[in-house]
Amino acid sequence: SSFFLNLINNRQGDYSRYIFFYLNYLIDNNKLNEARLVVEQIDYINSTLLLSQSKSWIDKEKFDDFGKIFSCKDHNDLVSEFLFLISNLYSSQDNFEKSNFYLNLSNYLNPKFEFNLSLVAENFFLNDEFDKVQRILKNFKKEDEFYYWFRLKTEAKIIIQEQDYENGIKYIDSKFNKIENPNIKIIFDLANFYKNSKNYEKAIDRYTEIILRLDDNSLIKSDVLYRRGGSYERMGNYEKSDEDLLHALRIDPSDAYILNYLAYSWLERDYKINEAMDMLKTAYDLKSNDPYIIDSIGWAFFLIEDYEEAEKYL
């Protein structure tokens, strides 16, 4: 079991499906306390849809729901999962036609695992086939809160694509307001919606709501502070922005993206130039292959008129 517990905290890859199957195994063998211990280590905000829904089921003692969608003893279910993994691989390579082909085979063998249809919806969305997306989304019902929220988010994104951000935000707002005691992950998603639509004041309010619920040294808190700090920065409230970003770095001083964001903000304001350059160099050392950070350090040298160094990165 320690192997699966380590997977939960592994930041190098997505092992969420393995953890789901482990939970399924534990519940099938009536090891409910072990299953509870596993989900205690899962954070809703950083988890995938499948793991968030699994954690919710266990938190609500809905253990039977696991067996309703998958059984390790059913050969069709096992082959279906193998086909789903192939489909997921093709999707990651933007080969949506082959991805959907294997997904259809997977769904044929195990139609109970309707959550897998979220990948079909994503494939069709990326191909701008919004009518097909809408039909698939109808499979996700209110009782499965995270997949239902995925449905609402995707419907809002379609409205944004077909109309505009304003109507998309109105839609997601109206649906969110009908949710009783929304999970912290749902609040986080809503805050990100606001930030992406440049509704920074609303985003800040929601991020603040989340921050107040998190432990002081949580890495998730660092991420939310980063997002709120970025919202303040976009509004021109640099004092609040710096406060949040520095707080985030006290929690996680090796986060290259926070270092990069704060340093570049300072350089643009002609503020703490030497310290900003040091932070950018640290960010580059941490993520030397990241195009975003390479571009930032190149422009930073350009801003301080060190054109020879800038040319190495730009």
Roles of regions detected by a PLM:
Residues 4-5, 39, 103, 137, ...:
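Hydrophobic/aromatic packing residues within the alpha-helices of TPR/SEL1-like helical repeat arrays
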Residues 12-13, 47, 111, 145-146, ...:
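Short coil turns that delineate tetratricopeptide repeat
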Residues 67-82, 215-222:
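TPR-adjacent "capping" and linker segments in tetratricopeptide-repeat scaffold/adaptor proteins
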Residues 29, 93, 127, 162, ...:
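Structural motif corresponding to the intra-repeat A-B loop/turn of tetratricopeptide repeats
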Residues 24, 88, 122, 157, ...:
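Residue-level recognition of tetratricopeptide repeat
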Residues 18, 51-52, 116, 150-151, ...:
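TPR alpha-solenoid repeat register
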